[in-house]
A protein has these predicted regions:
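Short catalytic helix/loop segments, enriched in acidic residues and glycine
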Residues: 24-40
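Conserved core of the sugar-phosphate nucleotidyltransferase
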Residues: 122-198
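Conserved alpha/beta core of the MobA/IspD/sugar-nucleotide pyrophosphorylase nucleotidyltransferase superfamily
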Residues: 3-5, 174-249
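N-terminal nucleotide-binding beta1-loop-alpha1 segment
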Residues: 1-23
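Short beta-strand-to-loop acidic/aromatic patch adjacent to the donor-nucleotide binding site
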Residues: 107-120
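Active-site glycine-centered loops adjacent to acidic/histidine catalytic or metal-binding residues
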Residues: 13, 118, 233
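Conserved N-terminal catalytic core of the sugar/cofactor nucleotidyltransferase
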Residues: 1-9, 35-110, 199
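A structural signal for short hydrophobic beta-strand segments in well-ordered beta-sheet cores
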Residues: 29, 152-154, 220
Length: 249
C-alpha cells in the first residue's frame, strides 16, 4: 500500500430495498449521471491523494471485482478486493474487520478512511475528514433527524450513546457513515470491533466509535450543511440524483 491513506469502501450488502435495480449488482455499482457510485467516491478520495483502496465485496462480488479491476487500470490506483463470504448473514462490523484486520496484519503504517459504499457526498466532506489529525467521524449537525438516522450523543468529546433508537431531542446529530482512524488507534479500533462482532454478527461497525472515543481523542467533523445521502431505497436514489445534478452541473 502507499504513502498516504487507505480508503476502505464497504460494498458487500444486498441492497434489497432497491430491487430491481440491485438484482444483479451491489449498490455501489449503481450509476448516476453515467458514473457508478464507487467510481465517484474513488475520484473524491483521489482528489485527497488517496491511491490505495480496500473494497469489501459480498453480494454479486464477481461484478464488483471486475469493476474494481477496471477502475484500478483506468486511474492507475491499487484496489484490493476482500470478500465477506457471510455477507448475507452479517453486517458492516464483519465487513469492516476484514479490511482493518488486513491492514494490521500486514503492518501497514497508513491511516484509513472508512466509507459506506452507498454514500454520495459533496467532495468537501472527504476533504475535511482526510485533513483530520486525529481519528474522526463525520456528523451531520444540520439535518432534521428521523427514526432511521444513526444518531449520537456527544458530551465533552466522548460518545455517550450511538444508534438509531436514541431520542431525536437529545441527539447531537447523525453519523453519516464516513470516518477516519489514524494508525496509532488501529489496534484499539480492531480490539473493540472484534468484541462488537462477538456480541452480535449483525452489529454495525458504527458502535466501535463509542468505546474508541473513551480511549483516544476523536474529532467530530461537522457537515455544516454540506450535502450527502446514503442510498437505501428509491427515495434516496432520487435524492442522490437531484443532489448530484446540482453539484455536478
Amino acid at each position: 500500500m502507499g504513502e498516504n491513506m487507505i480508503a476502505i469502501i464497504l460494498a458487500a450488502g444486498m441492497g434489497t430495498r432497491l430491487r430491481p435495480l440491485t438484482n444483479d449488482i451491489s449498490k455501489p455499482l449503481l450509476e448516476i449521471n453515467d458514473v457508478m457510485l464507487i467510481e465517484r467516491m474513488i475520484k473524491n478520495c483521489m482528489n485527497e491523494s488517496i491511491n490505495d483502496f480496500i473494497v469489501i465485496t459480498g453480494y454479486n462480488s464477481q461484478k464488483t471485482d471486475k469493476t474494481c479491476e477496471d477502475l484500478s487500470k483506468k486511474y492507475n490506483i491499487n484496489i484490493k478486493c476482500i470478500k465477506n463470504e457471510k455477507y448475507d448473514v452479517t453486517n458492516t462490523s464483519v465487513s469492516t474487520f476484514l479490511a482493518t484486520d488486513y491492514i494490521e496484519k500486514n503492518d501497514f503504517a497508513e491511516d484509513f478512511i472508512l466509507i459506506n459504499g452507498d454514500n454520495v457526498v459533496n467532495p468537501e466532506i472527504i476533504h475535511d475528514i482526510s485533513g483530520s489529525v486525529n481519528s474522526a467521524i463525520v456528523v451531520d449537525n444540520v439535518k432534521e433527524l428521523n427514526e432511521e438516522s444513526f444518531k449520537l450523543i456527544v458530551k465533552d468529546g466522548i460518545i455517550e450513546a450511538i444508534g438509531k433508537d436514541i431520542s431525536i431531542a437529545q441527539s447531537s446529530g447523525e453519523f453519516i457513515g464516513i470516518s477516519k482512524v489514524i494508525n496509532a488507534d488501529l489496534k484499539d479500533f480492531n480490539e473493540i470491533l472484534k468484541r462488537i462482532i462477538e456480541e452480535d454478527i449483525q452489529n454495525y461497525y458504527d458502535f466501535t466509535f463509542k468505546d474508541l472515543s473513551k480511549k483516544t481523542q476523536l474529532t467530530y467533523v461537522l457537515t455544516d450543511g454540506l450535502e450527502w445521502t446514503e442510498i437505501d431505497d428509491m427515495n434516496d436514489y432520487k435524492k442522490a440524483q437531484d443532489m448530484l445534478n446540482q453539484l455536478e452541473n
